[in-house]
């Protein structure tokens, strides 16, 4: 039973889905004004989780031909044949996405539903189907899926786009490339074997690491912008601490390149995101 649950959690990429759901909650709480009602925020967060899970499972389904070529993915259920890749899978995942969009529309409004749909569409179709095997900049556009999670949550509080929610969406957009490129650097041989043109595959190590550093600088700078829109000391401290650590590890990656440094940068990106989202969610609650 436990093994089956682990397989399903892997196929539906629930860890990514949980991060997206937290981003949606953060988006709702980052929007100025009174703290929104608990029920619609949680409903939209669930909708984001479900739509992200559907997109993640579709990613597994679509990439079943190349996953066996990569050490990291060769044991995925679709790659091994543990799950039969019949037509019911995409139909079921489409139905799950429709249900998630309907939940957001019912619990909040049409804007929240639109952002839930766009997040799933960008990851499942734009990134997975259209871009991943064609361009090294695939993950740059794919990073919009996290931004739409923020905007879905923000729409619960205020359907129109606020500067605060747009800045947080920008932070998620800028966070994704250096996060994923760091992992791709460590797994460069896997992506090369599968013929996927990730940035570390098509660019030199030096060029890739400099691009990661430049993106991290832009990310850290954008994460400080909420200070000009009323963000409190908790958020500012989290942004400085998490951003400073991520920036330090990105500089280290440029100076001492290698797999160990790349994974260190990857984990630094996770620390930064956790600190930022936690601060965004906690600070409004402490303020009452």
From Swiss-Prot:
InterPro entries named in the record: Protohaem_IX_farnesylTrfase (IPR006369), UbiA_prenyltransferase (IPR000537), UbiA_prenylTrfase_CS (IPR030470), UbiA_sf (IPR044878)
Membrane disposition: Multi-pass membrane protein
Protein's UniProt keywords contain Transit peptide: no
GO biological process, alphabetically ordered: heme O biosynthetic process
Cellular compartments annotated: Cell inner membrane
Pathway linked to the protein: Porphyrin-containing compound metabolism; heme O biosynthesis; heme O from protoheme: step 1/1
Biological role stated in the UniProt entry: Converts heme B (protoheme IX) to heme O by substitution of the vinyl group on carbon 2 of heme B porphyrin ring with a hydroxyethyl farnesyl side group.
Remarks, miscellaneous: Carbon 2 of the heme B porphyrin ring is defined according to the Fischer nomenclature.
Family: Belongs to the UbiA prenyltransferase family. Protoheme IX farnesyltransferase subfamily.
Protein's name in the database: Protoheme IX farnesyltransferase 2
Protein species of origin: Paramagnetospirillum magneticum (strain ATCC 700264 / AMB-1) (Magnetospirillum magneticum)
């Amino acid at each position: 039973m436990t093994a089956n649950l682990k397989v399903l959690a892997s196929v539906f990429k629930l860890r990514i889905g949980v991060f997206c759901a937290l981003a949606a909650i953060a988006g709702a709480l980052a929007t100025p004004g009174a703290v929104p009602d608990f029920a619609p925020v949680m409903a939209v967060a669930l909708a984001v989780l479900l739509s992200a899970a559907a997109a993640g499972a579709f990613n597994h389904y679509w990439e079943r031909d190349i996953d066996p070529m990569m050490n990291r993915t060769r044991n995925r259920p679709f790659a091994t044949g543990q799950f039969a890749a019949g037509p019911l899978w995409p139909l079921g995942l489409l139905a799950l996405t429709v249900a998630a969009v309907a939940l957001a529309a019912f619990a909040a409004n049409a804007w929240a539903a639109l952002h839930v749909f766009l997040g799933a569409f960008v990851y499942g179709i734009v990134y997975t189907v259209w871009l991943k095997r064609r361009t090294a900049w695939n993950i740059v556009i794919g990073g919009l899926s996290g931004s739409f999670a923020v905007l879905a949550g923000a729409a619960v509080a205020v359907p129109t786009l606020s500067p605060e929610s747009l800045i947080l969406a920008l932070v998620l957009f800028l966070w994704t490339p250096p996060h994923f490129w760091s992992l791709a650097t460590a797994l460069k041989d896997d992506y090369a074997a599968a013929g996927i043109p990730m940035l570390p595959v098509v660019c030199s190590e030096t060029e890739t690491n400099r691009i990661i550093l430049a993106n991290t600088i832009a990310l850290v700078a954008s994460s400080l912008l909420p200070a000009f829109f009323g963000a409190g000391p908790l958020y500012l401290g989290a942004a400085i601490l998490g951003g400073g650590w991520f920036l330090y590890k990105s500089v280290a990656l440029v100076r001492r390149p290698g797999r160990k440094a790349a994974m260190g940068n990857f984990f630094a990106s996770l620390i930064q995101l956790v600190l930022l989202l936690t601060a965004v969610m906690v600070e409004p609650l402490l303020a009452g």
